[in-house]
Amino acid sequence: MRTFKKTNLRAWQQSALDKFLATKPQDFMAVATPGAGKTTFALRIATELMEDRTVERVIVVVPTEHLKTQWSSAAARVGLALDPAFSNSSAVNPSMDGIVVTYAQVGMHPFKHRAVASARRTLVILDEIHHAGDAKSWGDGVKEAYDDVNHRLALTGTPFRSDDSPIPFVQYVDDGEGHKAVSYTHLRA
């Protein structure tokens, strides 16, 4: 059985990880301030799911090119090999655990990304998911590409958009009040 490097988690990360692992839902959103550890949290979920063979591939979707390398480097530190050089004209490197792509890449060729995601049991991490509505093609592409994946983990510090566009895979329920799932203070972040 393959094992990954486990780092100590902050209290909010451990609480959210426990909540995720209890049910392993198709959709899960982590909302946390910048610097709170969303990347670390997401990579822990990825390694847990890879380790227990719930998923066989990890795809990370980011808003900008420079974040592709950042995510790949962070993943390498926990033993997860994510290819930041994957392009819409290349094949998936079979020696890698997954890929890191931009929302723009997915928007340009959603059917290619759908094929990559559906070829194996997949976790898709949608970093800064609120950006998926920045260009209509980004949100539409993400929905087309990842509608049927096993697990989607959305990360954001901003769980809403100023233009009121819906964020893909976020369920909106107008109940007049919000409900927290996991909370933490700035000090605990």
What is each residue range found by the language model?
Residues 1-29:
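Conserved pre-motif I regulatory segment
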Residues 80-89:
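Conserved RecA-like helicase motor-core motifs
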Residues 116-151:
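SF2 helicase catalytic motif II
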Residues 56-74:
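Conserved Walker A/P-loop ATP-binding site and its immediately adjacent core
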Residues 90-97, 104-119:
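Conserved helix/coil segment N-terminal to the catalytic DExD/H
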Residues 25-44:
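Walker A/P-loop
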